Swiss-Prot record:
<comment type="similarity">
    <text>Belongs to the pole-localizer TmaR family.</text>
</comment>
<dbReference type="GO" id="GO:0005829">
    <property type="term" value="C:cytosol"/>
</dbReference>
<feature type="coiled-coil region">
    <location>
        <begin position="7"/>
        <end position="34"/>
    </location>
</feature>
<keyword id="KW-0963">Cytoplasm</keyword>
<protein>
    <recommendedName>
        <fullName>Pole-localizer protein TmaR</fullName>
    </recommendedName>
</protein>
<comment type="function">
    <text>Pole-localizer protein involved in the regulation of several cellular processes.</text>
</comment>
<dbReference type="Pfam" id="PF04363">
    <property type="entry name" value="DUF496"/>
</dbReference>
<dbReference type="InterPro" id="IPR007458">
    <property type="entry name" value="DUF496"/>
</dbReference>
<keyword id="KW-0175">Coiled coil</keyword>
Length: 98
């Protein structure tokens, strides 16, 4: 009994570690993107620019990023639909085999 419980604990810990690693990878990726964004912004901004020009650049960048977010949302929806279809196919296959 103890060995089964220990096995379950180890599996749960392994899954927890996997989720933590994935979370840290996302944080690393997000922070790298922020650094890249700031570097890009520094390239666009010039000393003699007006406030309005700077705001225009920022608004254009914001619009580009919002478009990307929308694209990713659509892609995730498509992937989710495909995953559900595959799950249904697997479930139906298992029923037919049993």
């Amino acid at each position: 009994m103890d060995s089964v419980l220990e096995l379950v604990r180890k599996e749960r810990r392994k899954n927890q570690i996997k989720r933590e690693i994935e979370d840290n990878d996302r944080k690393i990726r997000d922070n790298r993107k922020r650094v890249e964004l700031l570097l890009n912004l520094k390239e666009y901004l010039k000393v003699n620019m007006s406030y309005e020009e700077i705001i225009d650049i920022i608004e254009n960048m914001q619009s580009d990023y919002e478009d990307r977010v929308d694209d990713y949302i659509i892609k995730n929806a498509e992937l989710g639909k495909e995953r559900r279809e595959i799950s249904k196919t697997i479930k139906d296959f298992k029923k037919s085999v049993s």
